[in-house]
Amino acid sequence: MPLRTAPLPRMAGDLTFMRSRRATIGDLDAEKLAILGAPIEDNVGRKCGTRFAPTALRETSVYFGWHANPQFSHPVDIDVRVPIDTSEMHGRLVDIGDIPLEGLPAAVATQAISATMQRLRESCASAILLGGDDSIVHPAVAASSRGPV
């Protein structure tokens, strides 16, 4: 039986952002762009599902991953219709998973987000935080700044 050469189906494989490599904070350096999830919904009146946002964004991003589908491997700037060179991005982009926040009180979850973002800042890596609700903004910005926020 021949080996399958088609891209992985969306539901197969390790679910990472755009099928990027999985990493830990200890693996990061200034060249890396880290994707990090904060699945939390403590700041909304009723549980509305914002804690599922990091997973949903990863699931959707698989359609646009470098290895997911050859037709999306070379994105085009639609305003000027020129190809965008993403060849360097694949080596830089890593997914470090979600901050474990489930079941934590709001104050403890905020501290966990702040501590994780502080560790990311110390690694000098750039980061994209995929959220839950808007309560992730203040601890993320506070940890990323060098003074009071």
Task: Describe the role of every protein-language-model region.
Residues 2-149:
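Metal-dependent C-N hydrolase catalytic cores
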